[in-house]
C-alpha cells in the first residue's frame, strides 16, 4: 500500500513539473515563436524549446523514479547531422529520443497529434514535421521539409514503422526515410528501444522503479554503401534493431 501511495505521490509531483513546462512554453515561447516565424528565424526558438523539453524530460523521469539505461552512446556523432531511426513501441518513444540525444533534432510525427490541445502547441514550437500518411500530397510535403532540414545541417528523428507496435512484433519499415537518407547523403543512426510501453500503471500513474533501455547502433554512412546494401537498407536496419531487441529481452 505504501509503495502504491509513493508512486501516486511521485506522479502528482511529476505532472506538476510537466504542467509548469507547458505553461512556460505556451504563454511565453509560443508567442515568441510566432513573431520569429515572421522574420524566418524561428529555428532559434525551436532550438531553445528542444533544450527546455530535454531538461523537463530529465527532471520528470527523475521525479517519477524511472531509469533510462543508454548503451552505445559512443556511437553518437559529435558534429555531423544524422537521421535517428528507431523501432516505435509507445507514445513515449520521441521523449526518450530527446532524453538521449543532446543535440537538437527535428521529429517527424503523425498529423493526428495536431488535434490534441496544448500538445499540438508544444510540437509546433519544437519544429515537428507532421505527416498524414493517408495523403500523398501531405507525405510529399513532409519529405520536402525533412530534406530541407537535413540540407541545413540539422538532424531528423523518425520511426520507420509509421505507427506504434505496442510491444508486439516490430513492423516492416517504410522506405520513405531510407530514400531521404540516400537522396541527401545523410548518415543513419539506428536505435533500439525497449520497455517504453510500461511507463504507466492504468495509463496515468508513473511506474516508479521501471528501467527503460535504449541502444545506439554504429553510424551507417550511406555514401559508403554498395548498390546491394542501398537496395536492402530498410531490411538491414530493421534486422539490426530487432536482433538487439531480442538480446535485451533475454
Swiss-Prot record:
The keyword Transferase applies. It catalyses: a 1-acyl-sn-glycero-3-phosphate + an acyl-CoA = a 1,2-diacyl-sn-glycero-3-phosphate + CoA. Pfam families: Acyltransferase (PF01553). Disulfide bonds: none annotated. Pathway: Phospholipid metabolism; CDP-diacylglycerol biosynthesis; CDP-diacylglycerol from sn-glycerol 3-phosphate: step 2/3. Its EC number is 2.3.1.51. It comes from the Bacteria. SMART domains: PlsC. InterPro entries: AGP_acyltrans, Plipid/glycerol_acylTrfase. Coiled coil: none annotated. One of its GO terms (biological process) is phosphatidic acid biosynthetic process. Belongs to the 1-acyl-sn-glycerol-3-phosphate acyltransferase family. The HXXXXD motif is essential for acyltransferase activity and may constitute the binding site for the phosphate moiety of the glycerol-3-phosphate. This is 1-acyl-sn-glycerol-3-phosphate acyltransferase. It comes from Borreliella burgdorferi (strain ATCC 35210 / DSM 4680 / CIP 102532 / B31) (Borrelia burgdorferi).
Amino acid at each position: 500500500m505504501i509503495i502504491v501511495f509513493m508512486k501516486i505521490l511521485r506522479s502528482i509531483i511529476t505532472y506538476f513539473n510537466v504542467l509548469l513546462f507547458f505553461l512556460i512554453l505556451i504563454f511565453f515561447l509560443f508567442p515568441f515563436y510566432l513573431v520569429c516565424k515572421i522574420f524566418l528565424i524561428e529555428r532559434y526558438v525551436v532550438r531553445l524549446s528542444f533544450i527546455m523539453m530535454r531538461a523537463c524530460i530529465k527532471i520528470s523521469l527523475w521525479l517519477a523514479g524511472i531509469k533510462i539505461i543508454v548503451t552505445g552512446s559512443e556511437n553518437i556523432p559529435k558534429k555531423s547531422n544524422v537521421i535517428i531511426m528507431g523501432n516505435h513501441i509507445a507514445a513515449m518513444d520521441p521523449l526518450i529520443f530527446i532524453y538521449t540525444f543532446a543535440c537538437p533534432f527535428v521529429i517527424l510525427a503523425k498529423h493526428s497529434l495536431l488535434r490534441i490541445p496544448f500538445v499540438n502547441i508544444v510540437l509546433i514550437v519544437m519544429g515537428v514535421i507532421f505527416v498524414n500518411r493517408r495523403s500523398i500530397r501531405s507525405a510529399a510535403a513532409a519529405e520536402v521539409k525533412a530534406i530541407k532540414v537535413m540540407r541545413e545541417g540539422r538532424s531528423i528523428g523518425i520511426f520507420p514503422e509509421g505507427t506504434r507496435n505496442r510491444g508486439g512484433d516490430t513492423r516492416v519499415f517504410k522506405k520513405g526515410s531510407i530514400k531521404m537518407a540516400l537522396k541527401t547523403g545523410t548518415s543513419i543512426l539506428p536505435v533500439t528501444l525497449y520497455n517504453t510501453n510500461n511507463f504507466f500503471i492504468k495509463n496515468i500513474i508513473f511506474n516508479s522503479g521501471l528501467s527503460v533501455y535504449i541502444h545506439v547502433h554504429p553510424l551507417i554512412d550511406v555514401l559508403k554503401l554498395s548498390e546491394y546494401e542501398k537496395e536492402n537498407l530498410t531490411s538491414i536496419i530493421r534486422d539490426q534493431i530487432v536482433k538487439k531487441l531480442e538480446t535485451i529481452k533475454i
